[in-house]
Amino acid sequence: MKLEVLLLRHGQTQGNLEKRYIGKTDEPLLLDDMESMRKISALQKRLEQEGIAGSQKLFVSPVLRCRQTAELLFPGQEQVVIDKLREMDFGRFEAKNYMELSADPAYQAWIDSDGRLPFPEGEDRECFIKRTMEGFRQMTEQAWRENCGQIAAVVHGGSIMAILSCLMQDDYFAYQVPNLAGYAFQYEGAGKIQAVRRIEP
């Protein structure tokens, strides 16, 4: 059975605004930001146009920014929390930005590796992709068990890159998205994916 999947990145937080590595830090959305609220409204209209404004099953990463975004986009809909869809663990780089890390040799080594080295005291990309794909399978298997043809997940930029790069056998950074953007596609299991399209406000 084909499954229509929507993956969306959460809305903007203070850490995003300051270009910080925000993984396990549990930040709220910037709800007083008029531009963010305008984008949420525009994204809701886009989802209606795509016919995915009321997905049959709604999954979320457990952190506040994802749960708040899901409530704004799909008000009142039950949220199924998938712990394995948490953002990457940035380890020692957590909550810091480029300016604060630029003098750190470990950060320069990570940059030079194209992000392939593990974050000091954090995750490496391979482990993160493996964990995230376990979360993706958890979602799709639950949907098929419950005969759902359409699911949405409000997750992280890293989660989207991990899932799409794995399914498409493509470059990890090819699927970077800003806040409140993501991808929709049809999934048939066993890595079969089609009709991939980018979704943004």
Residue ranges and their predicted role:
Residues 2-3, 8-77:
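Active-site-proximal alpha-helix that buttresses catalytic centers in soluble enzyme cores
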Residues 5-6, 56, 147-157:
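Generic beta-sheet signal
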Residues 13, 159-160:
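Short active-site segment of divalent metal-dependent hydrolases/proteases
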Residues 47-54, 139-150:
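Glycine-rich phosphate-binding loop signature in dinucleotide/nucleotide-binding domains
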Residues 60-61, 130, 154-155:
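Short beta-strand scaffold positions
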Residues 171-195:
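Domain-level recognition of soluble alpha/beta enzyme cores
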